[in-house]
């Protein structure tokens, strides 16, 4: 039985699909900004982290193809490409201030640590959307399914695709009852998770941009989150494969047998640490956040 243990490499690259909720509710305040800005920053961090994680000399190795799909009333691909292409073509760079620890010698054999503020340029591939709109998560998963099916047909022996959905809640579209929207989306997500190649089944991970449940990482059962929206996301999440658990432990992410690959009250960047890229096998990811 396939175990989802194929390493993402130049010879066997993987497909990462990121679904980004851009609905009206994402305009609400969150962590000193808005949910949509927070989530969009997370997507840009994910892309940048993967590029840096796979850098070799002057350019990243093409161990991954990334597709970012945004959804509100409509569904559209916001950006896509191999790592080298994405590295060479951000929309712009944003300058942000960041606190770092600077070490210096005290003259007596000791080390002094001092917090200093530096400016850092962050590449931007996806811009936040600030408008009212529905939550056509179903349509986003439909497009993701099409991309995954095509990838699997062309990459029978490569890593099974991974889909990361970053959202604040439940699907709502076509003026339907939200409960019907959830049922339809759960059914489609199950279809996607049943897709497979020689490596294993397609994996769906979820990150909820909401702090109603506090911070919950890789829950073992749905009772660990009480909110309906969180339980819905739990229901459309794959179990963390055993082959991913070494990477999880390496990055201090708690997993147990049967844990689902969903996190609540976080930005989703942690989910990237589960993927075994060629450059990071057996190594920690201390530089990533």
Predicted region positions:
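Acidic, low-complexity intrinsically disordered regions
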Residues: 1-289
């Amino acid at each position: 039985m396939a175990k989802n243990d194929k390493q993402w490499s130049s010879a066997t690259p993987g497909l990462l699909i990121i679904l980004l909720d851009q609905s009206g509710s994402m305009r609400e305040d969150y962590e000193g900004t808005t949910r949509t800005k927070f989530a969009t920053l997370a997507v840009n961090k994910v892309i940048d982290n993967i590029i840096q994680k796979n850098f070799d000399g002057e350019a990243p190795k093409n161990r991954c193809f990334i597709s970012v799909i945004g959804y509100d009333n409509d569904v559209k691909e916001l950006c896509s490409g191999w790592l080298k292409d994405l590295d060479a073509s951000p929309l712009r760079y944003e300058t942000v201030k960041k606190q770092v620890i600077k070490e210096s010698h005290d003259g007596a054999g000791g080390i002094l640590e001092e917090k200093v503020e530096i400016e850092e340029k962050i590449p931007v591939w996806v811009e936040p959307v600030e408008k009212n709109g529905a939550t056509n998560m179903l349509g986003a998963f439909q497009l993701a399914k099409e991309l995954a099916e095509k990838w699997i047909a062309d990459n029978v022996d490569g890593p099974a695709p991974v889909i990361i959905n970053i959202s604040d809640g439940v699907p709502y579209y076509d003026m339907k009852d939200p409960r019907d929207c959830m049922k339809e989306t759960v059914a489609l997500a199950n279809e996607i998770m049943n897709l497979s190649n020689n490596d294993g089944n397609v994996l769906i991970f979820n990150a909820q941009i909401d702090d109603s449940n506090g911070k919950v990482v890789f829950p073992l059962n749905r009772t660990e989150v009480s909110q309906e929206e969180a339980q819905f996301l739990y229901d459309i999440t794959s179990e963390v494969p055993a082959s991913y658990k070494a990477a999880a432990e390496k990055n201090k992410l708690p997993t147990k047998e049967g844990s689902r690959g969903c996190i609540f009250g976080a930005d989703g960047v942690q989910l990237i640490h589960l993927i075994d890229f060629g450059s990071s096998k057996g190594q920690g990811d201390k530089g990533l956040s």
